[in-house]
UniProtKB/Swiss-Prot annotation:
Belongs to the dCTP deaminase family. The keyword Nucleotide-binding applies. The gene is dcd. This is dCTP deaminase. Catalyzes the deamination of dCTP to dUTP. It comes from Proteus mirabilis (strain HI4320). The lineage of its organism: Bacteria, Pseudomonadati, Pseudomonadota, Gammaproteobacteria, Enterobacterales.
Length: 193
């Protein structure tokens, strides 16, 4: 069962759930709290590698990822990031989120953006119990026109689902957690699997 808006507000008030900066009450509706787009992005430079062998030796995977992933792009205030048709880019939420050990979060893109071809969180929309940090967004433009994305715009909504108990291995206590305390548009760390 997911938390309703009243419970989200109560959990934020009690510090059981942390979203910084905290969304205003008008951005907490039904069963979700809105999240906004941050100003950090990364793009893929596909022309620098023919392919990435995801099951290859770790050093080769790392080398390929370093060739295809751009440095972090930090947009100045008021600037837009343009995502062209068929492009994949990483971005980050403006908000940092901290979940307790007994709650799993779910991030969904906005329907209004999907109707324009924007996929906000391509496949990985689960936020693990014990998570702390910004959420990296995997953008894909499946539409026909470039999309201008501006930091601060509402990009998605988080819902929160209490579990049957506390996780024995929440994300913040796992030694193998690749994205623990994530800040910025962190690229794939698939080679650490």
């Amino acid at each position: 069962m997911r938390l309703c808006d009243r419970d989200i507000i109560q959990w934020l008030d009690e510090g059981k759930l942390v979203i910084e900066p905290r969304p205003p009450v008008e951005r907490i509706n039904g069963a979700t709290a809105d999240v906004r787009l941050g100003n950090q992005f990364r793009v893929f430079q596909g022309h620098t590698a023919a392919y990435i062998d995801l099951s290859g030796p770790k050093n080769e995977v790392n080398e390929a990822l370093e060739r295809v992933m751009s440095d972090e792009i930090v947009l100045p205030e008021g600037e837009a990031f343009y995502l062209h048709p068929g492009e994949l880019a990483l971005a980050v939420t403006l908000e940092s989120v901290t979940l307790p050990d007994n709650v799993v979060g779910w991030l969904d893109g906005r329907s209004s953006l999907a109707r324009l071809g924007l996929m906000v969180h391509v496949t990985a929309h689960r936020i693990d119990p014990g998570w702390h940090g910004h959420i990296v967004l995997e953008f894909f433009n499946s539409g026909k026109l470039p999309l201008a994305l501006r930091p601060g715009m509402v990009i998605g909504a988080l819902s929160f689902e209490p579990m049957s108990g506390s996780a024995d291995r929440p994300y913040n206590r796992r030694q193998d957690a690749k994205y623990k305390n994530q800040q910025g548009a962190v690229g794939s760390r698939i080679s650490e699997d």
